[in-house]
Amino acid sequence: SAILIGSRFLLPSGQTYNGLMHINFESEGGRQAEVYRLPITGGENFLYLVEPGVYRIAPTRSVFGFYQEMMNVVIDGRQYRLPFPRDLLRQPPYTIKASKIVAMGILEARVLPALPGRQPQLRIRLDDGVSARRKVVQDTIRDMMDPNLSPETRESTIAWSRALQDSLMNILSEEQKRTTYKPAP
């Protein structure tokens, strides 16, 4: 089982591919909980292998296991510190089933323009709409067929091709579940 997440780093001047942030992906269970620290760099899609279970997005932890309230984001060589976004904490739990891929969406870090003499603000959100999840899966499928990849990398990604295809079909079926009639008042 795996999760698929994309990233986008936006400056006032446009998108950059030079960025880094970390989030945790954690299950319930106290000491026995599965905890994955996910590094996310700019403009890429990441396929992270996880154990089956129910997981939530969480702030990263310190060396001693305490949650870090502040999130560090590096964009174009500049470091930003901000409180971990509540929108990410409020995301519903993700149920990860064996040999399935869950497309989470695109994690977006946007630097807002600042007035002269003030620090720019940073907003982080997870774009988990159907179109964003579809784009992440389609881009991953396209990237895994790149002839410039090493044979070992291509073999490992092709092993996930069936799960990626199933994930894409599920997303497309969500997109087509629109009502074709006007409901009665």
Task: Outline where the language-model segments fall.
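Primarily secretory-pathway and cell-envelope proteins
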Residues: S1-Y36, S62-P185
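Generic structural detector for well-ordered beta-strands
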Residues: P39, L47-L49, P93-T95
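Short Pro-Gly-centered beta-turn/loop motif in secreted/extracellular proteins
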Residues: G42-R56, T60-G65
